[in-house]
Amino acid sequence: MANTPPTVLTFAATDPSTGAGVQADIMALSSIGCYPLSVITGITVQDTVGVESVMPLDADWINEQARTILEDVSVSAFKLGLLGSVENVAVIAEIVADYPDVPLIIDPILASGRGDELSNEEMQAAMCELLFPQATLITPNSLEARRLAYYDESDEVKHSSLEECALRLLGMGSEYVMITGTHERSNDVVNSLYGLQNGTPGLIKDYHWERLPGSYHGSGCTLTSAITACLAHGLTMEEAVHEAQEFTWQTLRHAFRPGMGQFIPDRFFWARESDVQEKASELQH
């Protein structure tokens, strides 16, 4: 019998386009050699253009799904995506609290790439107060970081630097914060990892990536799942963040456009590259 690969449990909503959501998590985790388990938090109506509606599942269903699989399978990490409701946030906080030694990676999704709202003030407060204190890493984009850092002081959002936001988020209890810069007006995309340096919270490293043309559906899900997968394989946080960004950038470089909306990251780009090389080799012989 083969050895069991690292197992990751993702809590996320569905996406019929497989660009984002639980389907994207499963693909990214599998591509990096993990075995994905999933708890469905909601059903969405969406395509590659945007999200039309979200139906959160009842919190009891979330609890039943998670408790049942966790009684059977040991997990190496938790990954959280779109949670759907305050009640779901609360029950998931209770679930992960029973596994304090398992890394908890949170992608705090507040809106779709098109700008469709997927959260509200009550959900944001619940995440900040119930989940972030338990988190190993949270991965907001710059817009989400500003909203979450000042969820109870909305007037401060527009006046704050991203570093100030990161420090406030670290103060909520997360061990690390990574703010992605795709929404910022910069030539390169700058992603910034924050955490404790010699006991003092602050910037650990800025990562600069070429800004690719186009708009992508599910890049955040891909990145956070990739970091989670790397941590499940035993990498340190800095190693995991670097490797996951490299993987995600490649998925975006190889992205395709199956519909009329955004591009979809190709989480199995390496498999198709291998196929091309193999076919080219066959032609040469």
Model-identified regions with their sequence ranges:
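Conserved N-terminal subdomain of the carbohydrate kinase-like
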Residues: A2-T10, I26-G113, E273-S274
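Short pre-catalytic strand/loop immediately N-terminal to key active-site residues, enriched for Gly-Thr
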Residues: F11-S17, L203-H217
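Phosphate-handling active-site elements
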Residues: G33-L37, P201-K205, C230-A244
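Charged C-terminal helix
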Residues: P56, E238-H285
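Nucleotide and nucleotide-moiety/phosphate-recognizing core
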Residues: W61, E87-D101, C128, L196-D206, ...
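Conserved phosphate/ATP/ADP-binding segment of small-molecule kinases
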Residues: E121-L203
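Short, small-residue alpha-helix embedded
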Residues: R146-R147, G214-M237
